[in-house]
Swiss-Prot record:
Belongs to the ORC2 family. Residues 23-41 have a biased composition (Basic and acidic residues). It comes from Caenorhabditis elegans. It holds the Pfam family WHD_ORC2. PANTHER family: ORIGIN RECOGNITION COMPLEX SUBUNIT 2. This is Origin recognition complex subunit 2.
Amino acid sequence: MPRPKILKRATVQPSAAVPVKKSTPEKEGSRQKKTNGKENASRNLQSNLEEDLEQLGFEDETVSMAQSAIENYFMQGKSASERMNNAKSRRGRRAGNGNTEEIEEDDEISNAITDFTKCDLPGLRNYITKKDNTEFEKRLEHLADNDFGKWKLYLAAGFNILLHGVGSKRDVLTEFENELSDYTYMRVDARKDGLNVKVLLGAINENMKLNCNVKRGQSTISWARSIRRKMNSQQLILIIDNIEAPDWRSDQEAFCELLENRDSVKLIATVDHIYSTFIWNSRQLSSLSFVHITINTFEIPLQELMTGDSRLLGLDARSNQSSHTMSSLDVFWKSLAVNSQKLFRLFFQMYFDTKKPVKFWDLFNAAKDDFIASTDAALRTQLVEFKDHRVLKWTRGDDGNDQLSGIVELRLVTEFLESKNMPLDEKKDE
């Protein structure tokens, strides 16, 4: 057997040596110092980075824990409602399978969620009204002694004042009214139902006796311009709470037109929303000439809460009592059949007599006695229409049965039914 050939590695001929540049001892020392400096800097950077990472990790953990706690508190209504809707959908799918145990379990979950998301609004109101305000009264007195004079100077110089900050500022404006007792002023609550820029223009025209009524087909901007021209020889100070209210956002151009004459119409207003200034563009902000003043009262905004859209308090748009007026109820009434109109009166009679949610089967028995509905299915059909028009809302009681709560205030319902010759019966004293 022939021996395999062993291949030898080729040797490379050494090339000509490249002469190495010799450095002086001074350069060697400086180079070594630079190297040591870089190593020290890298060590310091690494140690600082490790410390920052440790602190960052601790801060992130703290922030995440705080955020989760805040979200669990303030977002509980939303998450609970979503879970309740999911439970209802599961209950509907399982009803066809006849699985009664799962249905009962879902009912218990929905009942627990409903109880968890309930908010005792009367109790909340009583707590806020009984709160000790001595500290706030001292701050308000200090504000009146030191700042109210400056505010009047701002108004006299042709500027408008915009108050913002944490807490309700209604009492601040109420106290400032005392400083304006020698002037002509008008206080407006922009959150009040039915109040907007057009209503404000009508009130100015009537109270200032301008005789500048709106013409047929005249725009709000043109009407505001006419009122401004009529007020050349008069002066008015507008005090507006929550000028960023939804009904005021669309007519800000007309409002700016009214304030164009700074010698005649002056403004001091409050805002609460963090993005409230976005309702004005840059040109409008320039014409309004706001002096922004921060006032942190830290007072609970009771009126703002009750007229707002807080889902946590159950005052969202679907249950807000200020969402109905006489005209809206009249339109809804005309769309109802005669039996549905009788049911409307019967439900609110039972609801306002007991001042508690009306159980569905109690309402059905009463409706059956009055020949309004012969079956529970017919009654549910009528009540669904009431719910769609935000007249009542469905909840589930402690016993698992459906119950109904009215979301239109007593004064409005009483006045409306009297106009329809179907007044509510007065509750007899026991």
